[in-house]
Amino acid sequence: MAAMRSSREPRSDAARNHEALVRAATGAVHREGPRVPMATIAADAGVGIGTLYRHFPSREDLLDYLTHVSFEQVLDNAQAAERGATTAAEALRRFIEAAISQRNELVLPLHGGPPLRSPKTRAIREQIHQILRQIIDRGRADGTIRQNVTPREIVVFGAMLAQPRGPDPDWDMTCRRLLATYLAGLAVPTPP
């Protein structure tokens, strides 16, 4: 009987509750960290604690889910940046700008989220690093990216700029200026 239920589409109220829980949990983790009380998340979502535990049987399940969907989004960003850019520097700029614009939607280890436990999520992280390696290699080959740049450095810098915050146009502008400075620093220096 349970197998039949899992093959059907979720009821519309269950889907709405799931979406509300994910939004509330993301906001609560950004506000209070990964140890935020589960009751706070349920209250923020406007559902009872039982509904929360039906969707996510444990805190770890919830945090793993949030982290996994965040890494899926970052992977989508990396793929789009690689496809849509004509230069390596442009691809890196697009990748990091996407993270900045989504900063309040992502729950990642470098944003105070939990360490990665899921092999599937670790595999997505590796795909992201592989795409960034390809972008960096392209820039090395055409002489526009320094030889010593690593995917990890790109990810860490992007995560620093994409820290969750409330709306602040000045911060967005500051992030974009810092990004431009960073990308200029990645470039191979022109000889005197």
Regions of interest found by a model, annotated:
Residues 29, 56, 63-70, 106:
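Alpha-helical DNA-contacting segments of helix-turn-helix folds
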Residues 33-34, 54, 146:
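Helix-turn-helix/winged-helix DNA-binding modules
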Residues 46-56:
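Short hydrophobic/aromatic patch on the recognition helix
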